[in-house]
Swiss-Prot record:
An annotated GO cellular component: cytoplasm
Organism ancestry: Bacteria, Bacillati, Bacillota, Bacilli, Lactobacillales
Record family assignment: Belongs to the universal ribosomal protein uS19 family.
Keyword Zinc: no
Organism: Limosilactobacillus reuteri (strain DSM 20016) (Lactobacillus reuteri)
Name listed for the protein in its UniProt record: Small ribosomal subunit protein uS19
GO biological process, one term: translation
Signal sequence annotation: none
UniProt-recorded Gene Ontology molecular function terms: rRNA binding; structural constituent of ribosome
Record key words, sorted: Ribonucleoprotein, Ribosomal protein, RNA-binding, rRNA-binding
Role description: Protein S19 forms a complex with S13 that binds strongly to the 16S ribosomal RNA.
Domain of life where this protein originates: Bacteria
Length: 92
């Protein structure tokens, strides 16, 4: 179930503040965040966010087609190591 349209999209206030601070400066630094639940706004395009995956911060460069999605969608939290191999070479 999606978010109600009357509420609008969500983004952490601290994240919006950090983006607004960097809009004035020429140098764009990586914005570190733990807010995976924040929606990507059009004002985020061109910025790099370091999104926390539970272990480390993974850099995500925001492009135009990412607008409307959540930051956490682009950083997986689980690493797949493969299924256990079924060793049938050793016979009885």
């Amino acid at each position: 179930m999606g978010r109600s349209l009357k509420k609008g999209p969500f983004a952490d206030a601290s994240l919006l503040k950090k983006v607004k601070e960097q809009e004035g400066s020429e140098k764009k630094t990586v914005i570190k965040t733990w807010s995976r639940r924040s929606t990507i706004f059009p004002s985020f395009i061109g910025y790099t966010f370091a999104v926390y995956d539970g272990r480390k911060h993974v850099p995500v460069y925001v492009q135009e087609d990412m607008v409307g999605h959540k930051l956490g969608e682009f950083v997986p939290t689980r690493t797949f190591h493969g299924h256990a191999s079924d060793d049938k070479k050793t016979g009885k």
